Amino acid sequence: MQILVLLLSYLFGSIPIGLLIARLYNIDITKVGSGNIGATNIQRNLGWGPALVVLAFDIFKGGIVLYLAKMLGMSDFYLAACALAAVLGHNYSIFLKFKGGKGVATSIGTLLVMNPLIGLGTVVIAVGIMYLTRFVSAGSMMGGIAAVLLLLYHGDPLWQVVTATGLALLILWTHRDNFQRLQAGTERRLGSPKEAKK
């Protein structure tokens, strides 16, 4: 039973909603802008409306997977595994030859269900950094780190800390190119008219 739920978590996380939404506009989102299927690239190429749909669904993917796992009474180990499986599915989708997004929105979904207060705090910190710096990547990476620190400070259960740590590491890994561009001063800011590879 647990293995089946784990597999379904990965498969649901693998649904490339950004690709599907872009196809409604006759656009292959993997071939425009950064090539990423996430909300940021959708916003830059299709506008805020489609981007918000993609953002909402990607958050939903992470949240519903963990919610159902909790409702099924799964152990802490499998709760953490299902949350991470959903994000891994988004990042390495079986429907996209194991390519995908960067997992930020899906991670937010899992955090909001796992610990709503910490999840909201993480969103506030991430959005705040994005607003101040206009770097989506900086807000994403710092948000991932902040989630771990907030859980540790709040003294929350170990499985939540382990899950958040795994999510943060995945976010840092998928943003490694962004980090290098931040260091080099070539990262694109939110709202910048000039396209840059993301």
Annotated model-derived regions:
Residues 136-143, 156-167:
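Loop-to-transmembrane alpha-helix initiation sites
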Residues 28-38, 95-108, 135-143:
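Short, non-helical or kinked segments that cap or interrupt transmembrane helices
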Residues 9-14, 57, 86-90, 126-130, ...:
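Alpha-helical transmembrane segments of multi-pass membrane proteins
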Residues 1-7, 60-81, 112-118, 151-163:
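Helix-coil boundary and interhelical linker segments in multi-pass alpha-helical membrane proteins
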Residues 19-49, 178-198:
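Cytosolic, membrane-interface loops and tails of multi-pass inner-membrane proteins
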Residues 43-48, 69-72, 89, 104-133, ...:
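Interfacial segments of multi-pass membrane proteins
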Residues 1-24:
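N-terminal signal-anchor transmembrane alpha helix
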Residues 18, 23, 89-99, 126-133, ...:
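C-terminal ends of transmembrane helices
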